[in-house]
Amino acid sequence: LKNKIINEKYEITREEAIFLSQIPNNDMETLNILFDAADQIREAFCGKYFDLCTIINAKSGKCSENCKYCAQSAHFKTGADVYGLVSKELALCEAKRNENEGAHRFSLVTSGRGLNGNEKELDKLVEIYKYIGEHTGKLELCASHGICTKEALQKLADAGVLTYHHNLESSRRFYPNVCTSHTYDDRINTIKNAKAVGLDVCSGGIFGLGETIEDRIDMALDLRALEICSVPINVLTPIPGTPFENNVPVEPLEILKTISIYRFIMPETYLRYGGGRIKLGEHVKTGLRCGINSALTGN
């Protein structure tokens, strides 16, 4: 499979991905062969470049949505910080600090369902992105503001945003177990809207929501079909007060196995270490030879 992917740009099937997933988590000899193959695919398609991005929580708490993993949902009592949109001066200060520390990309992330019907917030965000763009160097701007129309996304693009972030979070099958206040198709449509106005899209998910490895594979196949350029891989950090606070953690070696399979499925994509990677413990460095070639930095 590795050779077919490298030499023929072969797209592996769901059945082939599931076959790889059946390697036992305690079979280190075979897992190491899988990890090395994923690393060779990464090297062939992506080279040695490692991309760094960073985000700030630009508006926090009181989210109307009921995503069961999220501290910022108004449906759960988590003690999360609550504040409105940050000032352009504070956003610029954070952008410059992160640029000086080596980040290639910088994003504002805001709580809430999205920007649809919220022209006041959209206009403020446009002002902030323009301000950051005017006062930084080569820092690329990304945005993460939930469900959006083409019109709102076009305004963000015109303000200098290059990439829009909107996770699928899990598979279509499992998504109703994660959130019921919006649908999987709402997320798909936002991704399509972003691509329609010329934005690159960053979209991935969270491991440990209660999904199966087949769900993770199905999400990856959807991401491939959507031609996503950056896939953040997050590991659930259970938040007290949320419905998922007692979720059983995914074994670190299963996470690494899944990352390797993602590299087989998406050979040219940035596979990005996101939140919760500390859950991998001593195995976190191994991810760098399983296909990871980018990371979200910061606290």
Where are these regions (language model features)?
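Core AdoMet radical
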Residues: 58, 75-93, 98-191, 200-204, ...
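Auxiliary Fe-S-binding modules of radical SAM enzymes
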Residues: 1-29, 224-299
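Active-site phosphate/pyrophosphate- and oxyanion-stabilizing loops and adjacent acidic/basic residues
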Residues: 39-40, 130, 260, 285
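Conserved, mostly hydrophobic/aromatic
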Residues: 38, 67, 166, 194, ...
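Catalytic cores of alpha/beta
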Residues: 148-158, 209-222, 278-290
